[in-house]
Amino acid sequence: MSKESVRESKAATEYRLSISSNPGSRRSSFGGSSEHPAGSGIGNNKASNGELREATLVDTLLLPQVQELKDSMITLDANLTHMNFIHESLVDLNESVSALLYGLMCNSWCVDFPNMPHHTARELGISKELARLKEEKQQLLADLQGTAQAPSLVLKEKEPNTSKQKFQLPKPPMVSTRSVVAPVRTISEEEEDDNTAASFVSNPTVMGQPPHAPPPVARSNNAKGRRRYSILQQIRNHDLTGQKHMVANLGGTVKARAATHPIPESAGEKRKSLAVSAVRIGNNKRLQTSRPPSGGRDVTMARKRSGTQPAILNTNSITHSSTGAVPASSAQGRRPPFR
């Protein structure tokens, strides 16, 4: 605020001693007035001494205090005017700051800050978990009610009472006193020469049993002397002998396949071997008797002449000598040599 405005405010403010008094009536008492000459005061003093004394007291004591009060009131009025301006400025600032704070608050409500900690996600997860547990509880209660109403189909196995069992020494093996009966050859064993289910190394038939062996288990007539067949044998038997042979060997598992894939039966055709089986030790006598004695001489002569590849010459000489000496009818009936 400039100095001119302060002067105008001071001039506009006028303090009077009384509202009804005339402004020009007592102005002469505030200071020395130029209207009255200096000699007039002396004449008045002569008239009355009491009035002079009162005028002196007012001029010396009361008028300076009133003048100070007037100046203080003018200063107070100016300060109050300044304070009013400051208050108005603060009101404007308060409105602006409040508007700014309100906008920031609205933005903080509408925007989800990622770094601000909040429990919304955790509370949602807890509510979902409680709902899932409630559904699981209802399902378990329904299952329990269903099992309580329905008859129990589960049989509890009795646990063996091991406390009452006493330790018993193992008994010595019993010596078998049964008479050994020669095994009966079944239909499946008759064609053992061309059967690939046999082992490559076949042991001779054991006529007796050792004393420590357990007694033989009784078997039914259908399962006696029967061996397990591979997939290749099943295909070969089904393709060559027809569905009757498969039903006889495999049981009722191939009835559906035999019914859907009928193959005509060829009774005159013999089963062919998928591989060369082993030769029994007891059957080597036929090979020795059928060979001519001159086979060994041919082998030695061939070795002396060539001197190389004795194994190939030996096999060729043996095969030639055996094929030349043994007739075709006997060669078909016996088993081929082990390779």
From Swiss-Prot:
Q: In which residue ranges is the amino acid composition biased (Polar residues)?
A: 307-332
Q: Low complexity compositional bias: what residue ranges?
A: 18-34
Q: Where is this region: Disordered?
A: 1-48, 157-179, 205-224, 286-339
Where in or outside the cell it occurs: the entry states: Nucleus; Cytoplasm, Cytoskeleton, Spindle; Chromosome, Centromere, Kinetochore
An example Gene Ontology molecular-function term: identical protein binding
Description of how the protein assembles with itself and partners? Component of the DASH complex consisting of ASK1, DAD1, DAD2, DAD3, DAD4, DAM1, DUO1, HSK3, SPC19 and SPC34, with a stoichiometry of one copy of each subunit per complex. Multiple DASH complexes oligomerize to form a ring that encircles spindle microtubules and organizes the rod-like NDC80 complexes of the outer kinetochore. DASH complex oligomerization strengthens microtubule attachments. Within the complex, DAM1 and DUO1 may form the microtubule connections. On cytoplasmic microtubules, DASH complexes appear to form patches instead of rings.
Give the UniProt family note.
Answer: Belongs to the DASH complex DAM1 family.
Name listed for the protein in its UniProt record: DASH complex subunit DAM1
* Protein source organism: Eremothecium gossypii (strain ATCC 10895 / CBS 109.51 / FGSC 9923 / NRRL Y-1056)
Which lineage ranks, top first, belong to the organism behind this chain?
Answer: Eukaryota, Fungi, Dikarya, Ascomycota, Saccharomycotina
The gene coding this protein = DAM1
